[in-house]
């Protein structure tokens, strides 16, 4: 059996805010659908051949599940990623050195989901 990871679903009571946040991080919009009673969008690093993040509305009366975690490897360029995120106007803590010698940057999106850059 061969499996291929295709993406993540994020559900939000404020999907436009979450959508804008991930666009600011540099993810590309590969699909977008919006109307009065529906919000769905997909973002990816480059195109739909890579895993995507789908953002959906949480229907009224439903609870938001928290917290999702997303991980990116940076090829040793955590500081460059940090500077790019700060230049985009996103407030985040400085990267930290881990006990094993690596560097990590943790960013929290508007819904409390964490994004870890290694």
Regions inferred by a protein language model and the residue ranges of each:
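Core segments of cupin and vicinal oxygen chelate
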Residues: 2, 9-50
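Absolute protein N-terminus
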Residues: 1-2, 118
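Vicinal oxygen chelate
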Residues: 4-13, 32-33, 41-44, 60-118
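Short, charged/polar, Gly/Pro-enriched secondary-structure boundary elements
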Residues: 48-53, 111-115
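Acetyl-CoA-dependent GNAT
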Residues: 55-60, 94, 98
């Amino acid at each position: 059996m061969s499996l291929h990871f295709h993406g993540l679903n994020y559900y939000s009571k404020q999907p436009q805010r979450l959508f804008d946040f991930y666009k600011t991080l540099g993810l590309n919009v590969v699909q977008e659908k919006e109307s009065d009673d529906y919000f769905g969008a997909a973002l990816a690093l480059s195109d739909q051949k890579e895993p995507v993040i789908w953002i959906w509305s949480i229907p009224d009366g439903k609870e938001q599940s928290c917290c999702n975690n997303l991980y990116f490897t940076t090829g040793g360029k955590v500081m460059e990623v940090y500077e790019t995120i700060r230049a985009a106007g996103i407030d985040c803590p400085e990267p930290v050195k881990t006990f094993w010698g690596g560097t990590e940057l943790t960013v929290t999106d508007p819904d409390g989901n964490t994004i870890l850059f290694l």
